[in-house]
Regions:
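Conserved beta-strand in the GNAT
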Residues: 56, 60-71, 84, 89
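Conserved GNAT acetyl-CoA-binding A-motif
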Residues: 111-129
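Short amphipathic alpha-helix that is part of the acyltransferase structural core
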Residues: 2-60, 168, 188-189, 193-196, ...
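A conserved beta-turn-beta hairpin within the catalytic core of GNAT-like acetyltransferases
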Residues: 72-85, 95, 173
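Non-catalytic, surface beta->alpha helical segment in thiol-disulfide oxidoreductase systems
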Residues: 234-254
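Conserved catalytic-core motifs of GNAT/GCN5-like acyltransferases
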Residues: 122-123, 141-155, 238
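Conserved acetyl-CoA-binding loop-helix of GNAT-fold acetyltransferases
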Residues: 90, 96-111
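A short, internal acetyl-CoA/4′-phosphopantetheine-binding micro-motif in the GNAT/acyltransferase core
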Residues: 86-95, 125
Length: 254
């Protein structure tokens, strides 16, 4: 990694003008297009005009932060004048060079410059693999402000106000047998995950439905916490972690 350069020289923010040519950090392809990346690119094209921010290391590496105004964030969280962090991820060569801190600080600086009341993100009592590192967030002052089952809404308030989970998100039950997955296109990994899970469930006679969350309104009314994926088994909410076939098989064997 380059040393001694200014942060704004190392980070790049996606815009409608550069979205088509910039890589999306967590899945980087040089020749063939990845369907999940292209689905996310289309999704981002609709979100950027709403104030959605995707900021990344200006290199072919995985180091980025993604956040949006809470009012237009596709999550069942309510509040005024907050930013919501979907993802903060650094891996591979950039790890250990302070880019996670730089990315987080860029978000917090952005929030203050825009006069926001604070910044929030989804966490859990036990760290989930597909959520941003909440211990890292705690170093900046993020703390739990609401709870839904084992999940927590973490917030850093600048003015003493706080967001909350939507009432529906605390329900965490639905009337459906087998596997139910709610998903959107925010994460590039989801496209292939859904395709493979559909095939697995069909091939193993597992009742399953996959519900594409395709609007802000639908996301705000979901019956569980959600960042970009939520799984139920026999009507009971399980996790925001993306599942594979063997994980579903274990659920059936319970």
């Amino acid at each position: 990694m380059r040393e001694g350069t200014e942060m704004d020289e190392e980070l790049i923010t996606l815009t409608p003008e550069n979205l088509a040519r910039e890589h999306l950090a967590c899945i980087i392809r040089t020749r063939t297009a990845h369907p999940g990346v292209e689905a996310k690119r289309v999704w981002l094209a609709g979100r950027l005009p709403e104030g959605h921010v995707f900021r990344k290391l200006n290199a072919r590496e995985c180091a980025f932060i993604e956040y949006a105004p809470l009012e237009t964030a596709w999550v069942p969280v309510l509040g005024k004048n907050y930013l919501y962090i979907y993802c903060l991820w650094v891996q591979g060569a950039p790890k250990g060079h302070g880019f996670g801190r730089r990315l987080m600080e860029s978000c917090l600086s952005d929030a203050r410059a825009k006069g926001k009341s604070g910044v929030c993100m989804l966490g859990a009592k036990k760290q989930k693999a597909w959520l941003a590192d909440q211990r890292f967030a705690g170093k900046f002052g993020f703390a739990p402000v609401d709870q839904a089952g084992e999940y927590e809404l973490l917030a850093l308030s600048f003015d003493g106000t706080y967001p909350r989970f939507a009432p529906e998100a605390k329900r965490q039950t639905i009337d459906a047998p087998g596997l139910t997955v709610y998903y959107d296109d925010q994460c590039p990994y989801i496209f292939e995950r859904v395709r493979k899970l559909r095939e697995y469930c069909a091939g193993h006679d597992i009742p399953a439905q996959f519900i594409h969350v395709d609007s802000l309104e639908a996301a705000k009314r979901l019956p569980c916490v959600f960042n970009n994926w939520a799984a139920f088994w026999d009507g009971r909410f399980l996790t925001v972690n993306q599942l594979d076939g063997p994980a579903v098989e274990k659920l059936r064997e319970r």
